């Protein structure tokens, strides 16, 4: 099947596990079908390694077109390359107030606290906490996660 053949199928009718990494990368980085993109990225993430990293980096380097995909790409990148995720989140932080995207960043910090305790990661958490505080709490999907993050990283 070609990429176009796959894109006309409902997202839940595609057998992502049977597709090779190159096709999954194409599906993950296309910008017309968000459910397909997210599902393809999920399969790459489940496989781990450089293919998941490459797709997440490509999604995050492109003009954002789906906030859920961007958020998922952030958590995927954090899972496979936390150092690169810190740099990428730092770049994205100044341009977003989207609680979905900020929530993904919060999830990364809480999932990998060792990477955010010192150096660039710690400096990032300070800026992220300041940004999170500017967004109404009820805008976040996970209020407990937001509260836990602010309790731990909010500047005093």
Regions found by a protein language model. Name each.
Residues 31, 63, 96, 132-139:
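Alpha-helical junction/boundary sensor with strong preference for TPR arrays
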Residues 23-25, 55-60, 88-90, 121, ...:
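Buried hydrophobic core positions in alpha-solenoid tandem helical repeats
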Residues 1-17, 26-30, 34-49, 58, ...:
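Structural detector for internal amphipathic alpha-helices that build alpha-solenoid repeat scaffolds
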Residues 85:
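Short, conserved active-site loop motifs that form the nucleotide-linked donor/cofactor pocket
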